[in-house]
Amino acid sequence: MSDTTGRIPLCLIGTVAGIAVIGLVGVFFYGSYSGLGSSL
């Protein structure tokens, strides 16, 4: 598993993608709930 030179592990891609999606969805719903989502 140490031969990842030039290749990004799928687990890392999945983790980053998951965090990004959860963060964006969380911010979107939080903004909408706070009343600031209409400006987006």
Curated annotation (Swiss-Prot):
What SUPFAM superfamilies does UniProt report for this protein, alphabetically?
Photosystem II reaction center protein J, PsbJ (SSF161021)
GO terms under biological process: photosynthesis
Q: Which UniProt keywords apply?
A: Chloroplast, Membrane, Photosynthesis, Photosystem II, Plastid, Reaction center, Thylakoid, Transmembrane, Transmembrane helix
> What is the membrane topology noted in the UniProt record heading this document?
Single-pass membrane protein
* Compartment(s) of residence: Plastid, Chloroplast thylakoid membrane
TM annotation in the entry: 8-28
The record's similarity note reads:
Belongs to the PsbJ family.
Say what the protein does.
One of the components of the core complex of photosystem II (PSII). PSII is a light-driven water:plastoquinone oxidoreductase that uses light energy to abstract electrons from H(2)O, generating O(2) and a proton gradient subsequently used for ATP formation. It consists of a core antenna complex that captures photons, and an electron transfer chain that converts photonic excitation into a charge separation.
Report the protein name in the record.
Answer: Photosystem II reaction center protein J
Whose protein is this, by species? Triticum aestivum
Per the UniProt record, the lineage of the source organism begins with: Eukaryota, Viridiplantae, Streptophyta, Embryophyta, Tracheophyta
Which gene is the coding source of this polypeptide chain?
A: psbJ
